[in-house]
């Protein structure tokens, strides 16, 4: 069957699974890892391990890097899992000039972590543009949009923690009603025009 591969995995092999991420990095219900929680920030989403982005404990690199002698990842003194993740992501910006991130399931990570990522990515893009003036498309700063299920046209805390726009989940249903009668969209557009004075949303028709 589709899930038969699970029959070949020893999920209780504590020593074996410790060679994976390591307990300082993730929580998951396999091996000897800490169990996931039941809130948005510590749960195991879609059976995936939850990265301990809230941890203040110095973690070192994930254990699996010890099996990768050709890795470019280097241990950084004093870094926590969040510090490593934001460092690695912003390094892509610094190396390749990536000018924006679209964040999925933003509610499952602490707001402070998103702000840390935005701050570091913004600095990294500025460095890249300064070093590559012939490749830079514009002088705009790093841009970040995110998905938080059910978010509509409102200036939530996400905007105060690094996000320039959030996906507007309301518009899909509103546009579907307009498809039957265009007059139905008038109120929606007027409400958006009234609200979107100092912030923006990313509206979509279908995903």
Indicate residue ranges for each PLM-predicted region.
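Active-site-proximal helices and loops of the catalytic beta/alpha 8
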Residues: 2-17, 87-206
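Core domains of carbohydrate- and sulfate-ester-processing enzymes
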Residues: 1-66, 177-200
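A generic secondary-structure signal marking the coil-to-beta-strand transition
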Residues: 47, 206-207
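Residue-level detector of functional hotspots within protein domains
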Residues: 37, 84-87
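Short glycine/proline- and acidic residue-enriched helix-loop micro-motifs
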Residues: 68-72
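Alpha-helical scaffold elements lining the catalytic groove of polysaccharide deacetylases
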Residues: 76-83
């Amino acid at each position: 069957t589709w899930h038969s591969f699970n029959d070949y995995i020893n999920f209780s092999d504590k020593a074996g699974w410790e060679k994976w991420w390591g307990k300082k990095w993730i929580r998951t219900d396999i091996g000897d890892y800490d169990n996931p929680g039941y809130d948005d920030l510590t749960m195991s989403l879609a059976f995936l391990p939850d990265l301990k982005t809230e941890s203040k404990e110095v973690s070192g690199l994930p254990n699996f890097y010890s099996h990768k002698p050709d890795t470019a990842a280097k241990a950084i003194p004093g870094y926590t899992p969040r510090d490593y993740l934001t460092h690695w992501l912003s390094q892509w910006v610094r190396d390749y000039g990536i000018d924006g991130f679209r964040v999925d399931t933003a509610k499952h990570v602490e707001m402070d972590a998103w702000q840390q990522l935005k701050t570091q990515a913004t600095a990294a893009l500025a460095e890249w543009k300064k070093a590559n003036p012939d490749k830079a498309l514009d002088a705009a700063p790093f841009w970040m949009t995110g998905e938080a299920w059910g978010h509509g046209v409102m200036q939530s805390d996400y905007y105060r923690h690094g996000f320039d726009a959030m996906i507007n989940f309301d518009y899909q249903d509103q546009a579907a009603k307009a498809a039957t009668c265009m007059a139905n969209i008038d109120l929606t557009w007027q409400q958006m025009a009234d609200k979107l004075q100092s912030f923006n949303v990313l509206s979509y028709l279908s995903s």
